[in-house]
Amino acid sequence: MAVTTVAQFATELNRPASTLLEQLQHAGVSKASASDPLTDTDKEKLLAYLRTSHGTSGADRKKITLTKKSTSEIKQADASGKARTIQVEVRKKRVFVKRDDPTGASSESHDSQDVQELSAAEEAELQRREEEALREAEALRRQQEEEAAQRQRAAEEQARQEREARERAEREAAERAAAEAAARVAAEAAAALAAAEKAAATAPAPAPVAAVVPKAPAPAPVVAAPTLAVASLGAKPVAPAPTSGMRVIKAADIVAGEAQKQIDLDKRRKAAEAEAAAIRAMMAAPKKVMVAKKPEEPKPVVPAAGAVGKDGIKGTIHRPKTAAGAPAPGAAPGAAAKPGEKKSVKSEKLSSSWADDAKKRGAAAPASKGRAPDVRGGWKAPGGARGGRRGDRGGAVSNFTPPADVQIHEVHVPETISVADLAHKMSVKGSEVIKQLMRLGQMVTINQQLDQETAMIVVEEMGHKAFAAKLDDPDAFLEEENLAEAGESLPRPPVVTVMGHVDHGKTSLLDYIRTSRVAAGEAGGITQHIGAYHVETPRGVITFLDTPGHEAFTAMRARGAKATDIVILVVAADDGVMPQTKEAIAHSKAAGVPIVVAINKIDKPDSNLDRVRSELVAEGVVPEEFGGDAPFCLVSAKTGQGIDTLLEQVLLQAEVLELNAPQEALAKGLVIEARLDKGRGPVATVLVQSGTLKRGDVVLAGQSYGRVRAMLDETGKAAQEAGPSIPVEIQGLTEVPSAGDEFMVLADERRAREIATFRQGKYREVNLNRRQAAKLENMFENMGQGAAQTLALIIKADVQGSQEALAASLLKLSTDEVKVQIVHAAVGGISESDVNLALASKAVIIGFNVRADAGARKLADGNDVDLRYYNVIYDAVDEIKSAMSGMLAPEQREEAIGTAEIRTVFVATKIGTIAGSMVTSGLVRRNCRFRLLRNNIVIYTGEVDSVRRLKDDVKEVKEGFECGIKLKNYTDIAEGDQLEFFEIKEVARTL
């Protein structure tokens, strides 16, 4: 059992501790202070004492109930979202029951059990009361939310009613004010106009007539109607009399609303007064005044200081006639206006025709007919019942707003554009463009294509600025897209082209580098097959282009793309600088790439290094030891001496050039060579210049496109990707691309197909549109101004003097129509590099006292390169002149072949009209041309359809024989007509 003190027990009983101590003393329990402990036995003694003291029998079973209250707080959110605190009071009861047990132990156990039961009951009661308190709090919250919603709805409804009443009152007041103002203004204007007309009719002609300025009415009547309306509106009962605090608040709100409405009405009243004053000032000017005829050159009217009347409107009074700048005696009276305004002058100018018309009708007509002049004020009276709107034309400021400035557009015109697109660019209708083209003499439809020149003329004729746009090529933005997608640039391997004379060891040098650097077991022929390979060295990777690289090098230079970074110039130590070496130097300098000189065959005993250096210096290749920029390497393709040094020099040049390319981007590069394989289809060898080419990418190369189905490296093995400066062989293109074409990877196959299709039909469409737009005057202007044709030549001679003389003689043959271009001129035999150069430049090779070697002849035969050999310079000049003549357009000439006389005309069934003729001279052939002469006058020119001799079709009939001639599409023939036969032959022109 829990032990409590006297003070705690007194608190439970709600009694003072001193009273409880006295009762305990009387009950026989000795407790000295309130802090003494109090046991259950002591409590039972106290209970027995109290029962006996209050007359209760101890034998009766009674119970004592102790009540304890506890208060707690619960936070609950209401409808507005704010937290509300709810007080929860919990009352606990503890009941003590005295039981009569035979023994004290059993009594104690029963008491413990009773206390536990009472504790459980108290807990259940506590839980029930808490739930009840929560339910009450929830009900209270819902009730508060409903009350708040009802109050809000009531407030909104009341506000809506007040707003509608206020708007209705304002609307009625404004309408009344406007009606009254309009009525007053109309009456004033009519009176002023009548007075002005009367004054003008009665006044003498030479005396100046003063302008009639009507007095402005007092503003009080204008204010009266709105004020009365507001007062009457305020007198209406809006709500019942306030009977509670809430009603008092609403009445105060209504009073505040009425005050606000009064303020708004005052503002509107002032605005209406200002508007009415402006209307009166505008209408104050005389609309129809009889004026004397003005002189031819009247002086401008100079108004005096405006006199301000009582109504606040400024007027203008003319000076006397003698004053400087005064008008003529017969001048019209000036209109009343504010200083600085030009309304009177403008209205006078605008209404001059109206005033003249009124003068023609006569000013005394209304009086003669007996009409009152002040009823309507003339047909121009602004305030009349029927002429109110027309009167504004006379003196009011015109509402006409001048048109805004025409906006001039900058139109970028592509090569071809439709009429609809051109109109859209100029922000005009398509019909306007069609009309403009009709004025220019061209009939078009809205969807018809226009060439760039015609479109630019139309744009300029319509007042806009025309600019020639770039080609509307869909791949024009590919470069920008690739630049935008390019990632970080990283170092890439250099691309090296080996050039030089074939006898100087170029092939042997490449073979040694390949066999020493490529892993064992790889087929060497594959590298030759794809034309490019790369070599791994301790210092980096080098990509070599084989002999076809010379051709690709030239083609790439023509396209402006440099695939070659470094050129290795191979020179034999025993031969020195040969003519083909000079060609290689010229190609390298034209492309702007550095040269690394490899002097080969240093192991031969007859090598002369000093002579080689001096010859190279003479050609402009200065070694580094002489202060130049070309490194010289002494190598031997036979022993391998100096190969490592050569590769190091190449890599050193690459480091100086800082060759970088993005790797994490779409691939882009060049087509080195391409062929059509019987089993695999189009196969192209490409050199990746930037990005990474992966299997499955969509490739666009020239006019061909496709998805990479297979990719092989230089060893013939399948590769999944290729980085910058790596050559690979790809399959999957739609057709064979051209060598030297740029290729790029696109993200969308549909876009690649569109670009390839556009490239195929681009020039065809442009030419078609240009032919369609050609006109007769343009044809006359362009006659004789066509682009001159060019004959490219490569000259190889035995000696320098012969080469210079032949080149000078051939250059003198150039004319305005055909020009001679010397691509290359040198001394020596015709080699493979010459044939490659001729292929790239489409030139003719001329050998003067020299011949081509076996390799060059084979290459020339395989690629249809024209080789010409001459021993006499005049023969060379004559043949080149004949070739230039063959490039000229042939001349058409008529050649008469015979004549015939028509002796009879008959009609054959299923054949038509037949001319029975006698061949009088020459002969007549089937399908030849003829002229029909009647009385020695040519009446028709046509073609012979067929010729018959004795019922047999023949090709020709000679002189002295009769034949039947059927003319094609012509039957108007008669006996005695003459037929003249001729043929048109093309004759070659000569220079």
Swiss-Prot record:
Pfam family, any one: IF2_assoc
GO molecular function annotations of the record: GTP binding; GTPase activity; translation initiation factor activity
Binding site residues for GTP: 500-507, 546-550, 600-603
Chain segments carrying region G2: 525-529
Classification via NCBIfam families: IF-2 (TIGR00487), small_GTP (TIGR00231)
Family: Belongs to the TRAFAC class translation factor GTPase superfamily. Classic translation factor GTPase family. IF-2 subfamily.
Name this protein carries in UniProt: Translation initiation factor IF-2
